[in-house]
Swiss-Prot record:
<comment type="subunit">
    <text>F-type ATPases have 2 components, F(1) - the catalytic core - and F(0) - the membrane proton channel. F(1) has five subunits: alpha(3), beta(3), gamma(1), delta(1), epsilon(1). F(0) has three main subunits: a(1), b(2) and c(10-14). The alpha and beta chains form an alternating ring which encloses part of the gamma chain. F(1) is attached to F(0) by a central stalk formed by the gamma and epsilon chains, while a peripheral stalk is formed by the delta and b chains.</text>
</comment>
<keyword id="KW-0066">ATP synthesis</keyword>
<dbReference type="Pfam" id="PF00213">
    <property type="entry name" value="OSCP"/>
</dbReference>
<keyword id="KW-0813">Transport</keyword>
<keyword id="KW-0406">Ion transport</keyword>
<protein>
    <recommendedName>
        <fullName>ATP synthase subunit delta</fullName>
    </recommendedName>
</protein>
<keyword id="KW-0472">Membrane</keyword>
<comment type="function">
    <text>F(1)F(0) ATP synthase produces ATP from ADP in the presence of a proton or sodium gradient. F-type ATPases consist of two structural domains, F(1) containing the extramembraneous catalytic core and F(0) containing the membrane proton channel, linked together by a central stalk and a peripheral stalk. During catalysis, ATP synthesis in the catalytic domain of F(1) is coupled via a rotary mechanism of the central stalk subunits to proton translocation.</text>
</comment>
<dbReference type="GO" id="GO:0005886">
    <property type="term" value="C:plasma membrane"/>
</dbReference>
<dbReference type="GO" id="GO:0046933">
    <property type="term" value="F:proton-transporting ATP synthase activity, rotational mechanism"/>
</dbReference>
<dbReference type="InterPro" id="IPR000711">
    <property type="entry name" value="ATPase_OSCP/dsu"/>
</dbReference>
<dbReference type="InterPro" id="IPR026015">
    <property type="entry name" value="ATP_synth_OSCP/delta_N_sf"/>
</dbReference>
<comment type="similarity">
    <text>Belongs to the ATPase delta chain family.</text>
</comment>
<keyword id="KW-0375">Hydrogen ion transport</keyword>
<keyword id="KW-1003">Cell membrane</keyword>
<keyword id="KW-0139">CF(1)</keyword>
<dbReference type="GO" id="GO:0045259">
    <property type="term" value="C:proton-transporting ATP synthase complex"/>
</dbReference>
């Protein structure tokens, strides 16, 4: 079952309130971020946990326990996953985690963004870019690398819907604009 956006938002709000009440904002934020990445492109796993015909509920809940408890995933997140399994709505887990991450980020003086590049960037390079962006916007920045083949060279960083463009393509566009402006 696919949940509506307002229901997904309610789940994220509930988990956010628990995180604040139990003073575990940072822990749940880190875990939400990791789980979002872990569940990306894991359609078969999500289907097994979502659809009743695949396995009975006890087996699906055991899969949750076996898979996530070994990584010390927060008990409240685990319980939310189990309820989603019961509701046959585990397909929404990643969306709920994304909303949760967004809400917790606001509370933790942190933000997430994307660094676009023509090829994959090393973890060390991402960390260096994160540090520079953190200084620039006075917030801790966590970046995810995504590939954009339209960039000619360089990188483009998007944080808070603001684009910081260091790509060759943007420089060429800027030169083109200046030439056209002078005509």
């Amino acid at each position: 079952m696919v949940l509506k956006d307002n229901v997904i938002d309610n789940w994220a709000n509930a988990l956010t309130k628990i995180a604040v009440k139990e003073n575990k904002v940072k822990k749940m934020l880190e875990q939400a971020h990791v789980l979002i990445e872990v569940l990306k492109n894991k359609n078969e796993f999500v289907d097994i946990l979502t659809f009743k015909s695949a396995h009975d509920e006890e087996k699906r809940i055991k899969i949750i326990d076996d898979t996530f408890s070994q990584f010390n995933i927060d008990e409240d997140i685990m319980n939310a996953f189990k309820i989603l399994v019961h509701m046959q709505a585990f397909v929404n887990a990643r969306d709920i985690l994304k909303k949760l991450r967004g809400k917790l980020v606001e509370l933790d003086n942190m933000t997430y963004g994307v660094v676009w590049s023509t090829e994959e960037i090393s973890a060390a390079q991402i960390k260096e870019i994160e540090e520079k962006m953190s200084k620039k916007i006075n917030k801790e920045v966590k970046l995810v690398n995504k590939i954009d083949t339209k960039l000619i060279a360089g990188i483009q960083v998007v944080v808070h819907n603001k684009v910081y463009d260091g790509s060759l393509r943007s420089k060429l566009d800027e030169m083109k604009y200046q030439v056209l402006k002078e005509k």
